[in-house]
Amino acid sequence: MARIAGVNIPNHQHTEIGLTAIYGVGRTRSRDICVAAGVAFSKKVKDLNDADLEKLREEVGKFIVEGDLRRETTMNIKRLMDLGCYRGVRHRKGLPLRGQRTRTNARTRKGPRRAAQSLKK
């Protein structure tokens, strides 16, 4: 298995798809990396030689990926929460941020329903 940016890239996949195993690299960025490195994106990962892998590592290294990207995202959310702005408050409460309705729906963000409280005594 090829190892790029601390991630094992699956051998059986094409280079373009295999690079998407790296957090922060999608299909578009993967294609751009392959073009910049001069590697055919239809080539399987197991068929890449050491020179190709080194070029890919160099190109991926130009972007913020994996742990650094996760840390940056977490810090941005923490900053919003510390500011106390609307988006930060919504993050803190675990509610949708972008104006979606919450009276019904929003189950993904709010989590599973709580058991209904019975009003009878």
UniProtKB/Swiss-Prot annotation:
Located at the top of the head of the 30S subunit, it contacts several helices of the 16S rRNA. In the 70S ribosome it contacts the 23S rRNA (bridge B1a) and protein L5 of the 50S subunit (bridge B1b), connecting the 2 subunits; these bridges are implicated in subunit movement. Contacts the tRNAs in the A and P-sites. SUPFAM superfamilies: S13-like H2TH domain. Belongs to the universal ribosomal protein uS13 family. GO terms for biological process: translation. InterPro entries: Rbsml_uS13_C, Ribosomal_uS13, Ribosomal_uS13-like_H2TH, Ribosomal_uS13_bac-type, Ribosomal_uS13_CS. Pfam families: Ribosomal_S13 (PF00416). Part of the 30S ribosomal subunit. Forms a loose heterodimer with protein S19. Forms two bridges to the 50S subunit in the 70S ribosome. HAMAP family: Ribosomal_uS13 (MF_01315). Residues 94-121 are annotated as: Disordered. This is Small ribosomal subunit protein uS13. It comes from the Bacteria. The keyword Transmembrane does not apply. GO terms for molecular function: rRNA binding; structural constituent of ribosome; tRNA binding. Coiled coil: none annotated. Keywords: Ribonucleoprotein, Ribosomal protein, RNA-binding, rRNA-binding, tRNA-binding. One of its GO terms (cellular component) is small ribosomal subunit.
